[in-house]
């Protein structure tokens, strides 16, 4: 009788552990979502929007830089950057193309920051294009700032989501984390650098009587270019 009771207890325990395991895993051994269901598609779409907006911002920076390069006689550098802009436009939403252009923009602006604009800027070319350059750079700064804030929010949400989603969705969420982490870490320094670069251009423009766009005009242009 005692032996039968022991067997009965073991069977009950085995069934209990099977039920507990089933609560945590589905029949395919995948972890179930806990609590509120994660909108993986929503996270992915927000990630894609971030990349598009950063790409738009960086293209705007690059176009503004090209105008300055041409005004200081850096024709070869301007042509090379134009090709990079065309490549980025052909690959809309491509994270690698965006990263490459971010790097090129940072290098180009760093090179131009070493130049004495008063001595090397062609004043006639500056009168024609400097206002537009300042506008494009201002647009990029605004779009970068918005993207950096949104990326920080998305990074926190996607990291929390990774603890809840199934194994089959984990890879997609990790991709979102990588995108948002890149933007949250790399884009604020770019925006700050370009803002300082723009300040130097504005100072030169004011010194030489060249009109500059208003803050309202820059914001209006940025709003028209931002993807929501």
Question: Where are the predicted features?
Answer:
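N-terminal export/membrane-targeting signals
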Residues: 1-25
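Immediate post-signal-peptide N-terminus of mature secreted/exported proteins
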Residues: 24-94, 224-228
